[in-house]
Amino acid sequence: MFTIKTLNAISPVGLAKLNKNLFDVSVDTEAPDGILVRSADLLNTTFNENLLAIARAGAGVNNIPLDRCSEQGIVVFNTPGANANAVAELVIGMLIAGSRNVPAAAQWTQGLAEDPNMAKDVEKGKKQFVGNEIQGKTLGVIGLGAIGSRVANCAIELGMEVYGYDPYISIDAAWNLSSQVHHCVNLNDMLPRCDYLTIHVPYLPTTKDTINAQTLALCKDGVKILNYARGELVNTAALLDAMEAGKVSGYMTDFPSDAILGRPGIVCTPHLGASTPEAEDNCAVMAAQEISDYLKNGNITHSVNLPEVHQPRAGGKRICIIHKNEPGMISQITALTTEAGLNIENMVNKSKKNMAYTMLDATGAVNAKLAEKLAAIPAVIRVRIL
């Protein structure tokens, strides 16, 4: 029986994916094997020694201490793409609403309550909110992952010309992307073409201020920008300067701040991107499936600190080893399995940056004594026998 601790409210649809005969799920477990979390801050949390995995029901993991988890052999999962449709729909909605000045027009209309000349004033006042259709306009998409590719495909269906930039596009994302999306190998080449620009990349030290004074200077005059990924991707000071100069005519974002609230041409929503019951269910289901498969079978899917490794069972017992990505590890591991007289049926080894994961199915004396010897290898962090 594995114990799972839930932090925050996790959708019952997701929890139902955890077999009650194998998983004891509780908010009170003191020393869990796994943690399911949404937004709870774990950065200063002391983890119990037997904690094996943390699954975040969402994409961002800035509330989880990744380096410390790696050092302790804790696999951290997220759920990329589970909320993709929710975010993509909102982006498309705000693209249209922002282009037609709907937010400002709707707010102005509220002031007409009990106006005896409402019909006349509506016809007179609507001129100040005239906007543009998006059909035939050009959209630039920075980041073509689960969300960016959906936005690009939807924009194509709406009759837009779409350019995409993503030097790290995955094979799956590329397969799902419309062939009508123009792929740019250089961001600077894409920016001058775009009437609208939307960004869909994770927040990392290397992506902070992706939209800055230099990139904005390359944009077409009057460009409208949408940011439904992370607030830090856009340099606020540079954005405000560009709006003051007329370079940027509109900014729609899910990340309000004092610096941008109340500014003309800026529309802020209260982090609505993934806030749908469907997205919460999808995230919870994916997180539960990831943590279940890892605890039961050692398979790793959508981990942010360990490599992607999954392998069908081949009989015997399964040995799972988290270790540092160093030369000679395989020879040290197989030397011990040979010494123990094991027959290896299947074996896989993959790495991710400075971390690696070796998983093998073997028949023979797979026991605690062997696990102790494997754990004694200097670069080994954790050993599990399943």
Regions found by a protein language model. Give the residues of each.
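Glycine-rich Rossmann-fold phosphate-binding loop(s) that bind the pyrophosphate
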Residues: L144-G145
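Rossmann-like adenosine-cofactor binding region
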Residues: L43-T45, P167-A259, S275
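N-terminal Rossmann-fold NAD(P) dinucleotide-binding loop
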Residues: G148-S149
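Oxidoreductase and adenylate-handling cofactor-binding alpha/beta cores
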Residues: A88-Q107, N153-M160, V285-N299, T334-T338, ...
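An N-terminal-biased, well-structured beta-alpha scaffold segment characteristic
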Residues: M1-T79, P192, N212-Q214, L218, ...
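Rossmann-like dinucleotide-binding domain for NAD(H)/NADP(H)
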Residues: A213, D221-R313, Y357, E372, ...
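A conserved regulatory-domain signal marking ACT and ACT-like small-molecule sensing domains
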Residues: T301, N305-L386
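Phosphate-binding beta-alpha-beta segment of Rossmann-like dinucleotide-binding domains, i.e.
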Residues: P80-T138, D172, H302-V304
